[in-house]
């Protein structure tokens, strides 16, 4: 199962509203990942995103599903700025998970 999400439809030209990210996460991302499906975030027409938006969108799925989330979340048509923010959030989440595993 693959869930394609047109980000522009939900966020307009700039992804910054954490409440929208939370709703997308709850209504679309988590149910799809729980069925081992893939989620494709299509950023066509979106010029930028805040780090807090991306964090609100993917941090809980990564925490809950771990490697399944890393393997099944995809980003299409993300410009360089958005790709960099996604990378920052992924690095932060990976370091956070590694540190938690180290402490256990």
Feature locations, PLM:
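Extended, charge-rich low-complexity interaction segments
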Residues: 98-104
